[in-house]
Amino acid sequence: MKRILAISAIGILTLSGCLKEDSRSYLTQEQAFTSAQNLYINSVALLYGYIGGSGDSQGLQGTCRGVYDYNTMTTDEAMIPIRGGDWYDGGLWENMYQHKWTSSDASLYETWKYLYKVVMLCNQSLADLQAYSHLASEDEIRSWTSEVRAVRALFYFYIMDMFGRVPLVTAADVPVSDVVQSERSEVMRFVYDELTEVLPHLAPERSNRQGKWYGRITRPVAWFLMAKIALNAEVYADDDWTDGIRPDGSQVMFEVDGIQMNAWEACTSLCDKLESFGYLLEPVYSDNFLVHNEGSVENVFTIPLDKNLYRNQFWYLFRSRHYSHGGALGGASENGTSATIHTMEVYGYGTPGQDARFVHNFYAGEVFIDGSQVMLHTGEPLVYMPMELKVNLTGSPYEKTAGARMAKYEVDRKSFSDGRQPDNDIVLFRYADALLMKAEAQVRNGADGSDA
C-alpha cells in the first residue's frame, strides 16, 4: 500500500512543520521523496505539526482535554468548576480535579492515541530516512535522524510521565502481537539515552527564535528535558509505586559528557549547560508571554503560533474569561478555568506580601479594558471572586464569577477565533524552571541550593 504524504509550500520557507495543509498538495510516497528538501519536509518537518494542535486532546499545550489539562486540572493549581448548567460535561472536570478518572475516560484515551500516533509517525520517519538516504548527504541524514529520535524521545517522555508502564515501540512495522508493556524505568532510560546519543548531532541553537531552528528540538531543548528526567528519577525509576518504597536519587546514575553522576548531580550539570549557553531570566517577567515573544532570553522551547500561517491554537485565555470579559475584548469566551484557592494562598493574594507577579498571571476583582470597567449584562460591574471557588458552584451567588482567571499571556487584540489563534508562542520550557530544578537538585544532594 502506498502511503499518502502532504507537502506544504509554506513549510519549505518556515521549516517549522506546523502549517495548514493544502489538500491539492497530496502526493504518493514515491512522488514525495524525490529530493533532499522533500525528504526533510516529509520525514522531519511534518512531525512538528503535532507538537501544537487545534482540536481536543491534540498538542502538548494549547488545546483542551489533553496533555495540558491532565497535568494541570488534576493538581492544586487550577480547576474548572461546575457553574450551574455549565461545565458539568459528564463529570469530566470534577473527576479530573478529584482524581476520579478511570480507564474508560474518553479524553484520556484520545490523549493516549495522540501521543502514540506521533511516536509511530517518528518510527515511520526513521524508516523513510533510511530508505531514501541516497537523496541527502551523510551529515544531513545523521542530523535529521537525530532530530526525529529527539522528537520521539520528547513524546515518550510525556507518555512515560503520564501513564507509567507503557509499550516501548521503536520500529514502524512491529506486529501488534509483539507489543508488550515496558517498565517505567526502562522507558525513562530509553528517553534519556536517546537524547544522550543524539545530542552531539542536534543544532547548538536557540529554538525559540525565528529562523531555521524555530520551534525545533535543538541541543538546549534536549538538555532541559534530560534535566527534568534526572530531577524526577526517583519517581520514574520506581516500577512498583504501590509499596511505599522509592529509589534514592543519589543512587540513580546518569551519564553527562561521558561522566557517571547521580540524578541530582546530573540535573545540576545539565541546568548549568543552559546557563553557559546564555539563557537568562527575562528582566521583565511578562515579556516572556508577549504577543511577539520570540525575542525572550528565557524561553527555551515554544510552540510557534502565527494566526496567518499555523493552525495551532491557544484556548486557555478564551476558556477562562467571563463572557462579558471576552465581549469587552471584541470576542467571546467560555467562563471556565479558575485558579484554585491554594494557588491564591501561594501568591499571597490580598495580603501585604502578595507576589508582584500575581497581576501578570491572574484577573481578580474588577476588570478594566482600555480604561473602561467591564460590566455584566445586568449592568453591574464584573468582579471576579478568587476565594469563593469550589468544585460545584451551582446555586452560589458567585456561580459565574468565582475564581481568579488566567492572564499571563498578553492579549492579542488582532487574534482570530475569539482569541484562540493569537501570535503569542506557547511557552513549554523556560530557563526559570531550569533554575528551580537546579536548586531542588542541589538541596536533595545535600547543599542549600543558594547558588542556583
Briefly describe each language-model feature range.
Residues Y158-M162, P167, R206, N232-D239, ...:
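Short coil/turn linking the two alpha-helices of tandem helical-hairpin repeats
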Residues N232-E234, A266-G350:
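Polar, glycine-rich mid-to-C-terminal structural blocks
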Residues R165-S185, Y236-A266:
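Short coil/linker segments at helix-helix boundaries
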Residues C18-T72, P247-D248:
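Membrane-proximal, proline-rich intrinsically disordered regions
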Residues G84, Y88-H99, Y349-R430:
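Flexible, polar/acidic helix-loop-strand segments at domain edges
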Residues T145, R152, R219, M226, ...:
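Structural register within alpha-helical repeat arrays
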Residues A32, A36-A45, G49-G55, G59, ...:
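Conserved, well-structured interaction surfaces
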